[in-house]
Amino acid sequence: MALKLCFPPHKMPSFPDARIRSHRVFMASTIHSPSMEVGKVKKPFTPPREVHVQVTHSLAPEKREIFNSLNNWAQENILVLLKDVDKCWQPSDFLPDSASEGFDEQVMELRKRCKEIPDDYFIVLVGDMITEEALPTYQTMLNTLDGVRDETGASLTPWAIWTRAWTAEENRHGDLLNKYLYLSGRVDMKQIEKTIQYLIGSGMDPRTENNPYLGFIYTSFQERATFISHGNTARLAKEHGDLKLAQICGIIAADEKRHETAYTKIVEKLFEIDPDGTVLALADMMRKKVSMPAHLMYDGQDDNLFENFSSVAQRLGVYTAKDYADILEFLVGRWDIEKLTGLSGEGRKAQDYVCTLPPRIRRLEERAQSRVKKASATPFSWIFGREINL
């Protein structure tokens, strides 16, 4: 999964959404703010920044029945997008063979290929890998969603099967990138491993409210963002002359594209069954802004690690504010939002809001870029404290 981009504050309308919501439970956060005072001690096992006031179980009970009614549909339309294990690539397909007599030579060749790749590229590759390695958090998030969670750990509902099999496919991504980076010798693996542990321990704050409408909109956005991010790291690896690394990033991007197809099909079905409730959910998710899975990233040193990583990704063109707007525009077209009919008054307002949001985001980003000061440099522990321009 991918990155977070920060946009300038702008007023967004609020939409009554009783059609998809039950009485909501609010849980106040006790986590401290991201701008910690010097000398202030971070509480153990807490995120490095404030999380939002948390809302739980916002889906109206009658809406949960929609997902029960879609079991057969999910079996026939979603599970078919999974690949048999024997037909899946595995990390060892792209790495030096440790059982081979030529292992040492293969490792030396790998190191030679990536020797000339610049440090800033490794920042985005490491950030992508860390995001992938926080997979336990993402499975946990999916299993918070009412009506589709795995109730037993081995449930045979198609929703539970999908979540487990999706997790199993995604697990290969972090494994492959982690091993490649370890063998490269270019990065501080202990600092990276600490960052992964911090991130999994902190969790994530997607603001999906145990609500599968919000959850599947979120994952639709995320899978496309990750597809774009890995596709761009593949492109840059090729430009830097490491064709094997380009192949690695490209094969991961292909998985993300297939997963995007599954999640967008689910939301497409929700628009077919409940267009009003679904467009309200989409507007709600976009009004809150899509926070990316690794937004609570921390390495024990840099309180602004995620923002700094995101700035490098923006500068290199790996994942940008333009991509954020493009993803929303793609989804609006994919789900034919402009053509929805029979909506309530609030549904029509939500429809207009999401359809006009992409150009607004682009305009705000253009203004923000025009105000950007000369790039500053900051050290990254992942590359032994060397400084990178943001």
UniProtKB/Swiss-Prot annotation:
Source organism of the structure: Olea europaea (Common olive)
Domain of life: Eukaryota
EC number: 1.14.19.2
Catalytic activity: octadecanoyl-[ACP] + 2 reduced [2Fe-2S]-[ferredoxin] + O2 + 2 H(+) = (9Z)-octadecenoyl-[ACP] + 2 oxidized [2Fe-2S]-[ferredoxin] + 2 H2O
Residues the record lists as binding Fe cation 2: 170, 223, 256, 259
Name of the protein in question: Stearoyl-[acyl-carrier-protein] 9-desaturase, chloroplastic
Stated family: Belongs to the fatty acid desaturase type 2 family.
Protein role: Converts stearoyl-ACP to oleoyl-ACP by introduction of a cis double bond between carbons 9 and 10 of the acyl chain.
This protein's record includes keyword Zinc-finger: no
UniProt xrefs under PANTHER family: ACYL- ACYL-CARRIER-PROTEIN DESATURASE-RELATED, STEAROYL-[ACYL-CARRIER-PROTEIN] 9-DESATURASE 5, CHLOROPLASTIC
GO molecular function, one term: stearoyl-[ACP] desaturase activity
Pathways involved: Lipid metabolism; fatty acid metabolism
